[in-house]
Amino acid sequence: MTWNFGDILDTIIPVLPQGHLALVHGAREITWQEMDQRSNNLGRYMLDNGANFGDKVGFYMRNRPEYMETLAACFRARLTHVNVNYRYVADEVHYIFDNSDASVVVYGKEFRDNVEILRPRLPKVKLWIEVGDGADLPADSLDYETLTSIGTGENLDVERDGDDLLFLYTGGTTGMPKGVMWGHTALRETQTMALRALGDVPETLDELKAHLQTNGPGEVYIPACPLMHGTGLFTAMAAMMNGGTIVTLQAASLDSDELWRTVESRGVQNIAIVGDAFAKPMLAALEQNPGGYDLSSLVSMISSGVMWSMEVKQAMLEHMPQVMLADSFGSSEAVGFGSSITTKDAPVSTAKFTTNDFCKVFDENDNEIPRGSETPGFIAFGGPVPHGYYKDEEKTAKTFKTIGGVRYSIPGDYCLVAEDGTLTLLGRGSVCINSAGEKIYPEEVEEALKLHDSVEDALVVGVPDEKWGQAVTAVVKVAEGAEFDDKSLQLFVREKLAGYKSPKHVFAGGPPFRAPNGKADYKSVTEFAVQEVAKRA
């Protein structure tokens, strides 16, 4: 069976109840019938005005209804979603849109200044569509609301394919961000894999239609984490493809009180987060206002992308004992490595995951590591996987390997595999830093630091941090005759890169940075940085 998300939408929308909500943002409500027409109109406009099947559409927005509407329009018009981190500075955004060959960009009005910088540098972009109030619209931009209202709202007369693509750009572990190319069928299969273990799952469009007619529309979800990252996007997509309701929060960053108030007012059943970086402030709000929120509607919380500690899970369950906490182990390149389910009566250790038959653990020579071995290895997923990285055959070959006739995705996560198949995650085998779910490439920060007159050399590492998971930490060699000022270096990096890439700590001195061959000694520098951070604690 092949799947296409555009075909799924065309199939399920006619059987959803009139007035059933598709998208909610504060007081704003968009029904499924409204979203149906608006997304069809937008998709048709893009096709009629320069976009062709398979063209890339850049999404430059925070969490808001227009993100999911535009996604639906892309699915229906056979256009390819391209995410961009809205925290990026202009040069970083330019790289994503240029590398992806975007021909359309849909952006929030708040990012207009960056768009005006980028516009002359991106001649391949044919349509710039602004999401906002329509006021003072730049001459070369189109108003989103106007485009969604132009047309009859009828379904597009297009024949779709199971290999239509969705791009998910990831910071990765080395080099610049890479565009992971997911086919619709493979991505849909990742949504249904886990459900098959729980019972019958619709395996065809007709079965999906009958399922919704019998059981009614899907549940109410809050993607509390950004839609421009995989956890938020894939969770919201799963809700959408089951006729559910997607509620986006209004605050620009996590506001735990708003989140819990929204759960209460909207009867939210499921929340998606990114580990302790979200869970800890959410827990703090519960503890500051015990019994102050009605969370009786809540059924589950899912997390992926960064550690969600057992202690925080247990504390959260004291406030909502009926909720199932699902910790998913995956990456942009592989969804469904494993999971751990925590309930009030069944706690699970931090970073331990139950895996499935698609997963194997291999050593550096592609030999399978047997269960129960104390030897760490790389986790590999042999189920539905992406086609590879866009325009990067070399990195595709390194990450997506065929071993024993099976094509595996091997993003680089180290783990131990127990006798029962349980995985204990040890972390990335590379030097990539994961700070609150954001992947940070050290060399990029190092290069920014070395542009400063006072820095002769620099290495950047991740230091364990209670709040962030890992804190970006720089160790620099001060140039002869220069003065060391950690605050000025932090500000300097902020001017060059997105704020979350700026070091939380900067130290001077330490061990020799490099071996005689010039290779960076990240191990020694990390040990030094950990010691220095501890001194400040």
Residue ranges of predicted features:
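Structural core segment of the AMP-binding/adenylate-forming
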Residues: 48-49, 79-146
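AMP-binding/adenylate-forming catalytic core of the ANL superfamily
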Residues: 88-95, 105-107, 261-264, 330, ...
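Conserved pre-ATP/AMP-binding loop-to-beta segment of ANL
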Residues: 151-169, 175-176, 211-220
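Conserved AMP-binding/adenylation subdomain of ANL enzymes
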Residues: 189-224, 228-272, 285
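Conserved beta-loop-beta connector loops within the AMP-binding
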Residues: 360-380, 419-420, 482-486, 520-521
